[in-house]
Structure formats: structure tokens, C-alpha cells
Amino acid sequence: MANDKIVIHGARAHNLKDIDVTIPRDKLVVITGLSGSGKSSLAFDTLYAEGQRRYVESLSAYARQFLGQMQKPDVDSIDGLSPAISIDQKTTSKNPRSTVGTVTEINDYLRLLWARVGEPICPNDGTPIASQTVEQMVDRIQKLPERTKLQILSPIVRQKKGEHKKIFEKIKREGFVRVRVDGDIHDISETFELNKNQQHTIEIVIDRIVVKSGDRSRLFDSFEAALRLSGGYAIADVIGGEPIMFSEHYACPICGFTVGELEPRLFSFNAPQGACPDCEGLGIKLEVDEDLVVPDKSLTLAEGALAPWNPISSQYYPEMLKQACEQLEIPMDVPYEDLSKADQQTVLYGSNGKTFHFHYQNDFGGVRDVDAMFEGVINNVDRRYHETNSDFTRDVMRKYMTELTCQTCHGFRLNRKALSVKVGGEHIGMVSDLAIGKELDFFNELSLSEQSLVIAKPILKEIRDRLSFLQNVGLAYLTLSRSARTLSGGEAQRIRLATQIGSNLSGVLYILDEPSIGLHQRDNDRLIGSLKKMRDLGNTLIVVEHDEDTMRAADYIVDIGPGAGENGGEVMAAGTPKQVARSRKSLTGQYLSGKRFIPLPETRRPGNGKKIRITGAAENNLKQIDVDFPLGEFVVVTGVSGSGKSTLVNDVLKRVLAQKLNRNSEKPGKYKSVSGIKNIERLVNIDQSPIGRTPRSNPATYTGVFDNIRDLFAQTNEAKLRGYKKGRFSFNTKGGRCEACHGDGILKIEMNFLPDVFVPCEVCHGKQYNSETLEVEYKGKNIADVLQMTASEAVKFFEPIPKIRRKLQTLVDVGLGYVKLGQPATTLSGGEAQRMKLASELHKQQSGKNFYILDEPTTGLHSEDIRRLIGVLDRLVDAGNTVLIIEHNLDVVKSADYLIDLGPEGGDGGGTIVATGTPEQVAEVAESYTGQYLKPVLERDRAREATAPAK
């Protein structure tokens, strides 16, 4: 039947070679192949792009301007396509207000639950809060000092969009004269033109009163009118004081603490009704950190102990400090740590009213001659951060600030009213701070009254289902309050995956990009179960994946190859896992069948006998652990998801080393002491951040080979005849570049009802240089032709020039031979950017005392790429360096010299060292989940090596 298959004819996106592919519908399908072979081109740039385009094209032009328009992919036809949803690796959100709870929409159900069955408890005296009668309201007003002026208001519209014309007509009919709109008093006879797209608050002025003893009946009438019109709410707006909120619903009878109407937005930290007024719902506040301002307390003030005031381009602040210290009698030649507390306070927070005379003349002759109070370095940094209009200055000042938990809401983000409402004895903030596994237990064990249970039953079902989905994709260690911007790409993707499982859609084409990233093998089994559950709902799942377990669990595999870039783009094999394993020309098949495998190292390196030791590491879930990192070895940190690997390596070790070696101002996570840093000279963090943020940044510029290539072109006879220097061949400066596109090679065209379109420059046709520059050639190729070469092609082209060939060869060695030298950095994936950084390290002179840190470098890599990567890492270690990586991939784990396994579980159940030693030693530790999965792999590979034919 035609409708049980997706049939693709003539796919040519990027490097795809006009391929035809047939994919079964309603199955779990894995697309695999070498890095750069064309997997994503087939899955995302062909299938997803066309599925999305067809859906968007069915909508109106008005809707399309918001959804964006996708270009038709380069394909002849696709039949049997469903609406497509892409679940990729992009981080969820950089917004500090976005949390796991808001992204998964579980917060919406929590807010609804607390609003409907929550019980307000007074935070002052612990008394249950009950509704207020009119008599209680009148009593409260009469307790105010005599002659206090106030007005009684009835809030009839609160934070609602619209023009509200009917509301104003109703107020007129009721006979009221004044109304307060968005905080301003107006006469009801005025003409109101409210913006219908903005939220408005409208309150009727019921009465204006001066408090005196004989006014009870008037107050009674006013409150009754206010409550009748607003549905039970009234405001006493005290002139010159705080307004008093009244409600027929909830107020403390002892202290008068009022909660107001229990509605979902009261429990939202993104709404003014619920947000903490101090941190505005962020849970954190930026404060200047003394440890960042004075990073080395052994220095004197004269030696530059105050980091923000060290001279960069001006002597203004050093001179001001010098004159202030002379006149305030603070010694500048004493180490900061030995200064008296009073002197330290003066240096940090100012002279507390004492003035000093300051005389300063700048380089341009400008003179400042004043008597002033000494501001103090911390106050100075804080003021400059908040007052400056310069992004540069703000970024510089931000380096000396740290995020501290808000002391008003204690990090819960909500105001006192929201946090006073309890369900099961806990407020919503406390429950959101539980790990998802424990939160699920809380709701499973929740005991409610019979009436509350009837209301809460459907809400609880949704909450439990969504929490279960998150647990089943290996995220039980996360909390709903965790900021979305701190999630890894893999975590963000699995959160979206859990959200999609919860939607229970069927007939959808889901396209996923390596969902196994960041998952331990134990958690991966659960993930595969979740993928199968989505398939069984009647969906087609297309997963771009290299994980062997996922491939073996798939119904169908499509292997793209044989190589990467121009050497890829063909279907090497397609069929069930068993069929692909029998394919002779499929590299994936050879790894699945065991004909090809990554061998165990012949010996484990003993290292150089030195180590870096961290004691008392206690950041996040780390349990005061002491860890030794041996030097001169290939060290891998393992553990189940959420066990504390990233916290230990990235938050503690990396920041400690960066602070000591690079004078980095980023504050390390909690630890007691560190030793052994003198044994290394340089920290190199090879992460997945972009190598550049503009189209002009590319592999050639990043690796430094472009300088050598420009030198070469400047030495040609034609360049010498024309007087062209090296700068002529740069697209960053005027002269040789195309000025129509400023050397970008592309132009951005803004469209009204369509997304911005990028088109090749009509003058240089995307070549980035002007015609005169392109007339200079080396071996028949101009500079633009060279930038269009892949790294592999360029190695052959520049074979006679060792300086260039050596740098290019490192790109090939790390599996980036398919990348073009001029490929914009903005188009490189995180894994490609990471390997680009690795390549640039390989061609540098090795001191043998470098410390390399990599976080999951196997992201996006096929087994063949991983084999190559291990070879590159071995080269760095063989040169005497230390390589430390966080990794789950067992091929990498088995190749390590030394393992540090954290766990045993994720979240609160982790943070301890379960095992350390060689892979063989860890494999024998029964408590180690890593060891349990590693042991059979070691046994399998020993057996393979014993039967493998001699080379």
C-alpha cells in the first residue's frame, strides 16, 4: 500500500546525491552515518522542511507572517508525508524566567491545583486564613488613626485586555462619579480611549472618607457596595499610606494578613500578582561579589588587589585610590588580607561621609579638582553596572557580580501571599524544588478531603502523567524550578520529547536529533521505551542517532555514506538492523555485526605520578567529596544522568583552574581546598560553544591557516607586480573584499509577510572578494576557490607547503575533512565546533603540561568518527598532557586510563564517588552502574581481539 510508506524521490539538499529513499510509516526509524554524511540533510532539511512547509502553506497569509515561511527543499517529490514536528538539540530558552516547569507546562497544572484546593495559612502566626465579613472590614478601618483620609474602591476589572466600553457605561448607570483606571483617577464623564491590546485595571471610587468614630454605617454601606460590584473585593486606598486589600474570601483574623482571590496567576512568578516584589520573580539578585572584586587577597592595593580598578586604558581609578588612601590613612603596601576590617570596609564600601581632595589630569589635559566622598570599589561597580548605557562597560562590571538567592522569597520566586497557600502541608515553591522523582512520590501520596479530591482528580492525573513522562526519559533528577537556560541540549530535547508524549498525538512525523546525548546506558533503556510508546500511538519516528542500543531497537535503519561532505550523501544500506548488519558496504553494518570495532588499548598509561586534588567539593548535589585527578593520563568522568559529573568538572575543577591559571573571575562551586595546580601550565576548555558569531568567521580563520594562505597569495608574482600585500586577501578589511556585501558574500533582504531571505551578493556572486583580487591565482586557484575547498582537498592542494598542510591535516584527523575552509562558523554544529577547537590544539607546540577538559565530545559522532577522536586524544596524552572528559559512550570509557564514576543515582541520590581506577577495576565494582554496563563490553572486545585476523 502506498500510504504505509514515505517515499522520497530525488533528494538533493546539501550533499545528498539525488537519492531515492523509502521509509516505513508508523515505525521507529534510525538514520545513521558518519558525521557530515548527510543524515541531517535528509531528516531535517528534506523531510521536516517539506512536512512543515506543506502545513504552513495551508494557512492564511496573516498566520504565515507569524509562523514564518520555509523554502521548498531540493527534492523531486515526497509521498505519504505527515505533519512534521522537530525535536532537536537546541537549548530550550535563554530567558531566566523559563524553567523546567514552565517549558513542560506542569506549572500551569500546579498553579491550578493550588488555586482550587490550596489552604491559606498566615505566614505571621500560622493561623488558617478564613473569609472576612463586612464587619471585620469596618473594624479594620476604624483602627486607623483618626482623621486618616482614604477612598473605598471596588476593583471590577483587573489586568484584562480590551476597551471596556460597556463597563464604563454600567458604572455611569449605577450613578458613580469617579473611576480609577490604571492607577489614575478620572471623572466618569470623560471620554475613555483604552488600548484594546493592553491590560487594564479599573476600580470604581465608591466613597471618600476621613476616619472618625461615628462613621460605621457609612463604611458598612460603602463596603457592601464595593463587594457587590466586584464580586467580593474592596480596596481601602489610604492617602499617603499602603492600600489595604479586603476580600470576603480570605484574611487572617489575628494580624489581618490578606491573601485575596485564589486564582492561578497568584502562583505565577511571571505575573505581577504572584511574583516576589524584590527579585521580580527571578529568585535571584545580582550582587557585587567581594571575592571577585579582590580575587587575590595576598596582593597589596598598590599591586592591584582591586581587580575592577586595575588600569586598562586610564589611570583614573588607580590615582583616585592612591590619593584617597593617602588622605584616609589606609596603607597601600600591606597585603589586603592584613588590612584592618575598618580599612577593608572603607576600600570596598566608601568613606562613610569623610571627604578627600582629588586632583587628576588626563592624557588630553582635562583636569578634575574636587573634594568628594570616597565611593568604594563595590559601590562603584554596582553604580556603573546600573547607570551605564554602554554594553561593553556593563559586561565588564558583570564579571565582578554574582547571582545570589533572593533573601525575600528565598529563591522560590513568589510573594508571601502565594507562598502562604499550602497543599499537603507544602507551598508550591517547595514542591517545585523537589527532584521530579520525589515530586511524583509527593503527588502519589497526597491526601485530600473528599470535596477537594473531586476537584483535584483531573488536575492530579495530568501532573502525575507529565512527571512520569519526564522520569521515563531519564530526567528524574531535575527539579521543576531548574532554570531552562542551565539545561544541556540533550536534557532540553528530552523535556520536549516528554511534552510530546504527554500530548498523545497520533499520525505525526516526529524527527529527533540524537536523543541519547547525555544519557547513561541505564537511562537510555528507558528512553528507547518512551520512543516505542510514541510509535505505538500511531506515529512515525525518525531518529538521527549513532547509539548502538537505539539502532538495535529500531524497526528500520537508513545508513548514509560512504564518507562525509562531498564523499557522502548516498544510501549505503536500508532495512532492519539485521539486514544492515549483513551489508558489506555499510560502515554502520560492519560495526553492528562486530566485523569492525574500536579495540581496547594495549596498555593503560600509569601517568606521571602527579595529581590535582580537590577536597570538600559540595556544589549542587556533591556530598563533600575529595577527588584526585591523575596527570599525564586519559581520565574519564562517568555516572548516571544527574549524578554530578558536570558540577564536579565544569563548576568546580574547571573554574578553580581558570581562576588560578587564567585569572578568570568566574566563581568556582563550593570546595574546601585544591592542590597540585603547580604541576600544570595551561587549562584548555574545549567546549561546544560557537567558534565565531559572524559569517566571516570560518575554519580557515579559526585554525590560523588563513594567515599562511594569505601570505602565500601575497608572495605570488602577480600580487607582487600589483603591489598587493597580505591584507589585500582579507575579507574583513577594505581593499580586496567586495564592498557591496562587506566581504560577507551574502545580503539580507527583509520581507514583510515572509522571513528574512539571504541571497548571494550580485556583485561578487558569493565569493566575498572584488574581481581584481580574484585575478591573483596560485596553482590556477584564486583565494575564493581555496575557501571553497574541503579540508581534505586542501591537504592535497597544499601538499608541498608543510606549514599549511600540517594545520589542515589536523582538521582531517578529527573527522572534519568534509568541512569547507570558508564555511561560515554560524553553520557549524556544536560537535563540529568542539572538534575544530581540538584540531587547532593539535598543531600547537605541546609543552606536555596542558590540562584539556572536554564535555561529551562524542556528540554527533559515528563509531568510526569516535575511533578517530580517541586517536587524537591519545596523541595529546602521549605528548605528556592530561585529557579529562565527561562521557557516557562505552567505546570512550573503555579506552580511558583512569575512570572516576559518580553516583550511585541522579539528583539527591548522587554526588558521591562510587568507583575509581582503570576500566577493568571499575567493571568489578557491583555498586557502579557504569561498571555493570562496561564489564560485558570489555569481555566482548577481548573475545573479538582474540578471534580477529592478524593485521
What are these regions (language model features)?
Residues 1-951:
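Conserved phosphate-binding elements of NTP-dependent enzyme cores
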